[in-house]
Regions:
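Short, well-structured alpha-helical segments in soluble
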Residues: 51-68, 159-173
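Active-site rim beta-loop-alpha module in soluble metabolic enzymes
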Residues: 122-181, 187
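N-terminal beta1-alpha1 ligand-phosphate binding loop
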Residues: 2-25
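Short, glycine-/small-residue-rich phosphate/pyrophosphate-handling segment
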Residues: 13, 105-142, 156-159, 212-243
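Short, acidic/small-residue loops that bind anionic groups at enzyme active sites
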Residues: 86-108, 190-207
């Protein structure tokens, strides 16, 4: 089985980290193909970044189709371009936020999210609403740290995340914590040990869900809005998409 893991930003260090985390959780025989776009933002921290990154995600999906991968994962917590990617791809496409939310709902009646910048809280809340899981999330908590700062993780970072997670646990009754950034993919075990709660990393959750969908022979339904894109002419830099 070959799973394409797309880091939608252009940080090579983060792509490497995400790829290692994905391969570590994958079962024997599953090959992880970690990649990122050639063009786009170095980190994704808002709607503008997501809009630009979506074009890169779709280009990587195109490459994955040519490589005939068995599944695609979008490894950014905003799930940028997820529905467009499902429309474009023939193999299953999983976003790490959606994967993490659903995984958390299976092991706890209430969960909280610990993410990076405060401005991304609303984006996470919008995703929870879209996926129908808002009522299960006690809060989206932020550590006010830029995404790229996660590349230099240490004890201070874990303690900062643990402080927010403990508040969600003690004040709100959260029974599980969702990591709100693909760049946190290597921090789940340390945080879980620090707070005594299950911690769900979306990259790991997405890999296991992708393996399960492939095993079950399931992929995106092409009935309705996720049917293949309607053929039409494209101009300029997108002319290659014409059909």
């Amino acid at each position: 089985m070959r799973i394409q893991v797309i880091n939608p930003n252009t940080s090579e260090a983060m792509t490497h980290k995400i790829g290692l985390a994905a391969q570590a959780i994958a079962r024997p025989g599953t090959q992880i193909l970690a990649c990122s776009p050639d063009d786009g933002p170095l980190s994704i921290e808002g709607h503008f970044d997501e809009a630009i990154a979506t074009l890169g995600v779709l280009e990587e999906i195109r490459k994955g189709r040519e490589q005939q991968v068995d599944a695609h994962i979008i490894a950014c917590f905003g799930d940028p371009g997820l529905l467009a990617a499902r429309e474009y791809a023939s193999a299953p496409v999983i976003g790490i936020a959606e994967a993490a939310f659903h995984m958390a709902s299976l092991i706890s009646t209430r969960f909280a999210v610990v993410t990076t910048l405060t401005r991304t809280r609303i984006i996470a809340e919008h995703l929870l609403q879209r996926y129908g899981l808002s009522e299960l999330c006690t809060s989206v908590r932020c550590i006010d740290l830029p995404v790229l700062a996660l590349e230099e993780s240490g004890p201070e970072l874990i303690e900062c995340m643990a402080e927010q997670a403990r508040r969600a646990r003690d004040d709100e009754g959260a029974g599980a914590i969702v990591l709100g950034c693909g760049g946190m993919a290597d921090l789940g075990r340390q945080l879980s040990e620090a707070i005594g709660l299950p911690v769900i990393d979306g990259v790991a959750a997405a890999v296991k869900l992708a393996e399960s969908l492939v095993d079950l022979g399931l992929t995106t339904s092409k009935h309705g809005d996720l049917a293949d894109p309607i053929g039409k002419p494209f101009k300029g830099r997108f002319a290659y998409l014409s059909r």
